[in-house]
């Protein structure tokens, strides 16, 4: 059963997701800041598949770890849940009868509308609440065994990141985990240039043109603010996480798991 808050603003017009990403195919006279509205939402799944290296494998790994840490009577939070791909994947891996509920939070009503549709089509029967919310504001996290930040924290203004991690830590039950997947900077400028070049080569292999790559890069310039790997690790440790490890790394992408001791 999918449960929605009355104020979650998911009453947008019906949307069909799964379209091919062509947001930046045409030359634009002016490239506006990237956003997660309707035009992005309907192509978002394809965008991730073609823009994030080994995306399906990352999703599988995130789901496996979430299942490892999920506990009866607790809540699994997905912060920046977008179209709920991760929640659906986790639900398939949980043992039958495990009593957990999901909370998905996203700032885009259109993403939440597609999330509700995907969860219904995936046959998710555990309780799931989809909330319209901005991570730049205060979070409400409690009784959590798992909290996910999958390619989300990089879009949060840096001045709010410590607070978010602290609120996650405080809302986790003992032995609960935070799973963090981020685009990251190289530890020095030479490595960073190499990693970015190879990333763009990957996008070309996946069908993006140089124009699309350039225009999306410009759109993201003031929106996506990545940290270095060590900065993210220090951020987690600084807010209380003592056990932090890396489970995926590809050039300028990294995935980490942190456990509350």
Question: For each predicted feature, which ranges?
Answer:
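Class I SAM-dependent methyltransferase SAM/SAH-binding core
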Residues: 77-78, 84-137
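Core SAM-dependent methyltransferase catalytic element
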Residues: 242-261
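Class I SAM-dependent methyltransferase Rossmann-like catalytic core
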Residues: 29-33, 38-58
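Short alpha-helix
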Residues: 222-239
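A short glycine-rich, Lys/Arg-flanked "PGG" loop and its adjoining helix->strand segment in the class I
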Residues: 162-174
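A short acidic, Gly/Pro-enriched loop at the edge of an enzyme's catalytic core
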Residues: 139-147
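Conserved class I S-adenosyl-L-methionine
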Residues: 177-205
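Conserved alpha-helix/loop element of class I SAM-dependent methyltransferases that forms part
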Residues: 54-72
């Amino acid at each position: 059963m999918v449960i929605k808050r009355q104020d979650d603003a998911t009453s947008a017009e019906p949307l069909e997701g799964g379209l091919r990403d062509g947001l930046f195919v045409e030359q634009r006279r002016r490239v506006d800041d990237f956003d997660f509205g309707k035009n992005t939402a309907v192509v978002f799944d394809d965008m991730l598949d073609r823009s994030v290296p080994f995306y399906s494998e990352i999703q599988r790994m995130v789901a496996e770890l979430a299942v490892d840490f999920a506990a009866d009577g607790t809540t699994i939070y997905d912060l920046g849940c977008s179209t709920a791909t991760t929640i659906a994947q986790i639900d398939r891996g949980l043992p039958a009868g495990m009593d957990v509920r999901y909370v998905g939070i996203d700032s885009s009503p259109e993403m939440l509308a597609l999330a509700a549709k995907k969860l219904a089509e995936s046959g998710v029967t555990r309780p799931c609440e989809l909330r319209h919310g901005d991570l730049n504001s205060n979070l409400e996290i409690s009784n959590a065994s798992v909290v996910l930040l999958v390619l989300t924290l990089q879009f949060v203004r840096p001045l709010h990141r410590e607070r978010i991690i602290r609120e996650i830590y405080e809302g986790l039950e003992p032995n609960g985990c935070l799973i963090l997947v981020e685009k990251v900077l190289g530890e020095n400028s030479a490595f960073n240039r190499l990693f970015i070049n190879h990333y763009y080569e990957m996008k070309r292999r996946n069908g993006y043109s140089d124009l699309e790559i350039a225009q999306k890069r410009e759109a993201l310039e003031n929106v996506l603010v990545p940290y270095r790997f060590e900065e993210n690790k220090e951020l987690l440790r600084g807010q209380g996480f003592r056990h932090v490890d890396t489970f995926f790394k590809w050039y300028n992408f990294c995935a980490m798991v942190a456990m509350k001791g």
